[in-house]
Amino acid sequence: MSREQGPPTERTTHRVVAGDARELALPDDSVELVVTSPPYPMIDVWDETFAALEPAVGEALSAGDGDEAFERMHDVLADVWAEVARVLVPGGIACVNVGDATRSIDGRFGLYPNHAAVIERCRAVGLSPLPDVLWRKPGNSAAKFMGSGMLPPNAYVTLEHEYVLVLRNGGTRQPPSERRRRSAFFWEERNEWFSDVWTDLQGRDQALDSAVRERSAAFPFEMPYRLVNMYSVQGETVLDPFWGTGTTTLAAMASARSSVGYELEAELVADLADDLPAQARALAAARHRERLARHREFVRERRAEGSEPGYRSVAYEFPVMTKQERRLVLPSIEAVRRVDEGGDGDDGSSGDEGDHSQGGDHGQDGDHGRNGEGARFVVEHGRYGVEDE
């Protein structure tokens, strides 16, 4: 693939802020996409976190009032959704991965429908729900039988799915045409990604492979990677207000989008930031290699069926199904530099260089770095091509 056949090399910026997402120090209308997974209300591991943010949560739990605790937990999250609505551009998308909870409170077992509560509060701040995705997760066979086992009528259905809620801020938007074209996905990916049931994602205890095996994420890398490519274009900015282990940042880096993440636990940011460059490069290379290989296999299968795709990729010189795919280019990561005071990037350069991003940096210009310690990276992108495989 010649260098003239793809997009110009560009830089994206990525900032992680140790701060409270209920007060995002970001300008209005400054990010195009939000991809996140909040703490799940009524999952007991998050009780202490919610109670610290809202004492009424702890009081309700102590009183055995599960319904009141559920509402107060979602009131905490509602402040974040209000900020999400404020910083999203008109037509911007928010994707929220959330699961419902089952729990016994004061001797009474029941379902707490987190997905419905998130939708309700997002609608209240002006976000419009679109068709969502059910992420069906492999079930734990030991937990299949809840309640009375084999005896009716008191057994319970086992939850084996979570939701990816998709919400839009206003009407549709039209990014620049050239960026849309090079950010296209393959025809067969369109059919898979935009299905309303995903069964091909590994669950939360997934071990990351190769250079990132020692780290795990709140959700598998493929989820934010897929959503970033579905709902934004290269050079735009992605926000994750519940940064966690940084999987959305990794997906944005791999996809040539800028990103901002907020995380309450400063120690978590400090512990994970140094690993991001190596993780991003490994994940981007592996995922893009896989996408090209899967497309070539798809073409072989079509030809075996006597059907030849009608167009040809400019960058990769293989057949594609539609005219919209002709300018598709997968971005490479050429270098990652850490440019805050925290340390060096993976190419050994020091953190003394300014922001030279050619796109998507409008969400990075606020004073949100003042909210707390964090990390900032500049990523140089090229074109992932045949020579990289």
Report each predicted region and the residues it spans.
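Eukaryotic intrinsically disordered and solvent-exposed regulatory patches
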Residues: 152
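Charge-rich, low-complexity intrinsically disordered segments
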Residues: 173-174, 306
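Extended catalytic-interface subdomain
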Residues: 175-180
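S-adenosyl-L-methionine-dependent nucleic acid methyltransferase catalytic domains
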Residues: 1-146, 155, 185-389
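Core SAM-dependent methyltransferase catalytic element
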Residues: 89, 157-158, 163-173
